[in-house]
């Protein structure tokens, strides 16, 4: 499940990282709007139309119009070009003349000293603007390259940082279940290995211990290895502590985490075996021996031959029960 989720998320994460780190060209579009200014006509030339003059307002280059103004301007069939000039010491007449040569039908300039305005009739409209028009005058030279568009660096960097943080959180959220599954899987394997060797309490007479060669007695604690071999706890624990690798003394099968991960329980003929595990051989033999003794105790032999016959019958019954249990 975790691999399937990662396979589904990986392409989206790679595309997101590529979009965040890649540089793309940016185009800025300027919306043109119509603005009305309060103006007064100059005391010369043709009077201003009472309906007011409307045109396409452009900033003069250079802004003070002390030299020839750059032109022509972009063609606009609906409006005539109007020039916006910043007064920096040049005469008003020279400014109007340069605007006329550049193709403008009107010029908007600041006032000169009183009494210095002289009229000339060939310039159609000349307007004297107050403070609202001066707001449009730039404080620095305009960008000479038409492809140069200013970009707010701070906002672009912030947008990239937010996109990178969001993509990182998304990838970590998708990978967290997979990492947590790996950790829980390792814990489950360790617990399962520790539970392979179990300590049980012996309740019936059975075989002897292969280490000390003593018979198992009722009430003794035995340790059963995954290979189904059982030993006294007092015998197998020193064996594991001295051995370089933990293995069964009889079959030499490796039994990892047997000594430290032992669990306590009780073994008896009445208790069912562990789920998924067959009962060990010594337990089956103990059951057969007890069953055989019960059958012998029930039969009361009167003669030697009858005793032999009863013993043979008991052994046949015990063998049939053992065959059914092993199957």
Curated annotation (Swiss-Prot):
Annotated signal sequence range: 1-28
Catalytic EC class: transferase
An MF annotation (GO) of this entry: ubiquitin protein ligase activity
Major subcellular site: endoplasmic reticulum
Gene assigned in the entry: Znrf4
Distribution of this protein across tissues and organs: Expressed exclusively in spermatids (at protein level).
Keywords from the UniProt entry: Endoplasmic reticulum, Glycoprotein, Membrane, Metal-binding, Signal, Transferase, Transmembrane, Transmembrane helix, Zinc, Zinc-finger
Pfam family, one: zf-RING_2
Quaternary structure and partners: Interacts with CANX.
Residue intervals annotated with topology Cytoplasmic: 172-327
Record protein name field: E3 ubiquitin-protein ligase ZNRF4
Bilayer topology annotation: Single-pass type I membrane protein
E.C. designation(s): 2.3.2.27
Organism: Mus musculus
General function of this protein: E3 ubiquitin-protein ligase that acts as a negative regulator of NOD2 signaling by mediating ubiquitination and degradation of RIPK2. Also catalyzes ubiquitination and proteasomal degradation of CANX within the endoplasmic reticulum. Could have a role in spermatogenesis.
Annotated region (Disordered), positions in chain: 256-279
Any single GO CC term annotated in Swiss-Prot or TrEMBL for this entry: endoplasmic reticulum
Domains as described in the record: The RING-type zinc finger is involved in CANX ubiquitination and degradation, but is not required for interaction with CANX.
């Amino acid at each position: 499940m975790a691999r399937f989720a990662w396979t589904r998320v990986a392409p989206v994460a790679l595309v997101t990282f590529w979009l965040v780190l890649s540089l793309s060209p940016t185009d800025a579009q300027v919306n043109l709007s119509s603005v009305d200014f309060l103006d007064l006509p100059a005391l010369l030339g043709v009077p201003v139309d009472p309906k007011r003059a409307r045109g396409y307002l452009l900033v003069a280059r250079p802004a003070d119009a002390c030299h020839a103004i750059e032109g022509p301007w972009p063609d606009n069939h609906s409006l005539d070009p109007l020039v916006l000039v910043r007064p920096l010491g040049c005469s008003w007449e020279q400014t109007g003349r340069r605007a006329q040569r550049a193709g403008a039908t009107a010029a908007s300039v600041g006032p000169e000293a009183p009494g210095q305005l002289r009229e000339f009739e060939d310039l159609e409209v000349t307007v004297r603007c107050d403070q609202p028009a001066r707001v449009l005058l730039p404080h620095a030279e305009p960008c000479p390259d038409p492809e140069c568009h200013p970009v707010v660096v701070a906002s672009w960097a912030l947008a990239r940082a937010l996109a990178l943080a969001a993509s990182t959180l998304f990838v970590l959220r998708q990978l967290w279940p997979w990492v947590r599954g790996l950790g829980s899987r390792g814990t489950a394997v360790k617990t399962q290995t520790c539970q392979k060797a179990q300590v049980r309490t012996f309740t019936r007479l059975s075989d002897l211990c292969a280490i000390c060669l003593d018979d198992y007695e009722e009430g003794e604690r035995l340790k059963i290895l995954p290979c189904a071999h059982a030993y006294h706890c007092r015998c197998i624990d020193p064996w594991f502590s001295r051995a370089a690798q933990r293995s069964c003394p009889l079959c030499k099968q490796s039994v990892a985490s047997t000594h430290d991960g032992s669990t306590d329980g009780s073994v008896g003929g009445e208790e069912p075996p562990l789920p998924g595990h067959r009962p060990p051989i010594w337990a089956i033999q103990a059951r057969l021996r007890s069953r055989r003794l019960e059958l012998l105790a029930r039969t009361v032999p009167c003669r030697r031959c009858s005793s032999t016959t009863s013993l043979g019958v008991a052994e046949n019954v015990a063998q049939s029960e053992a065959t059914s249990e092993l199957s």
